[in-house]
Each structure stands twice: as C-alpha cells, then as structure tokens.
Design a protein with these regions (language model features):
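Single conserved hydrophobic/aromatic residue that forms the stacking wall/gate
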Residues: 1-13
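Membrane-interface extramembranous regions
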Residues: 12-73, 80-141
Length: 141
C-alpha cells in the first residue's frame, strides 16, 4: 500500500514536472512566433509598410512601428517568462487587429489568395486562443 502511494506520488510529481516543461516550451514558442515577425517588420519595413498601406490600416507608419515594438518586446518577454500576463493580452489584441486589417479574406475575390488569407485568419484565431490560455495560466504560476 505504501509502495502504491509512493508510485502515485512519483507519477503525480512527474506529471507536474511535465506540465511545467510544456508550459515553458509553449510560452517560449509563442514568444518566438511574435519575435521573428516583429524583427522582420523592422528589417523589411518598406515591404511591410506597403502591405499596411494597401490594406488601409490607419496611421500606417505609426501602426507598423507600434506592432513591431510590441511583437519584439512582448515576444521576448514571453520567451524569458516576464510580464507574461500583460504580454499575452497585448499580443492577443495585436493578433486580432492583424486579423481584421491584414487577413480580411471577406474583402477579397474568391481565389487562392482568399483561401490563403482565410487560413491565416483561422490560424491567428488559434494563436489568439493560445494567448488567452497563456494569460490565465500565467496568473496561476
């Protein structure tokens, strides 16, 4: 009986350890998901600015700069485990704004580009959901 209790404890402890590792790896990958595009916005500013102007995003230079800063800063913070709650919520808002301004498939002709933007839109909804879960989880650790 004691051995069984001891075995359960080991299983429970390893489950907690695995949960912690999954949280850290998931948080790191979500951070990387935002850091890399943020850096791309800086180093390929003109290309990204052209897209932002084409999609009629308000205040294109300011908006693009702000999104790049948010993605770089909060993406990095997610990766290192700082400001996770705030970072996840800010990046969730950024993700929704990108979805509605950049991946607006409903404003496109029915072709391969529309299908691609629909896929990006749905993918971003999954990222948005992950950020919401991360924000909740970060308040519990």
């Amino acid at each position: 009986w004691i051995g069984l209790v001891g075995s359960e404890m080991c299983i429970r402890d390893s489950s907690i350890t695995a949960d912690r590792y999954f949280y850290i790896v998931g948080r790191f990958l979500l951070g990387l998901y935002f850091l890399l595009p943020g850096l791309a916005k800086v180093f390929l500013f003109q290309d990204n600015w052209d897209v932002v102007v084409l999609r009629e995003v308000p205040f294109p230079t300011f908006s693009l700069s702000l999104v790049a800063i948010a993605q770089i800063f909060f993406g990095t913070m997610l990766m290192v485990g700082k400001y996770v709650y705030m970072g996840a919520l800010v990046l969730a808002v950024v993700t929704l704004l990108i979805n509605f301004y950049i991946h607006d498939f409903w404003n496109m002709a029915e072709d391969a580009n529309q299908a691609h933007e629909t896929q990006n839109f749905v993918k971003n909804l999954g990222i948005f959901a992950g950020l919401l879960v991360l924000s909740k989880r970060s308040t519990q650790t």
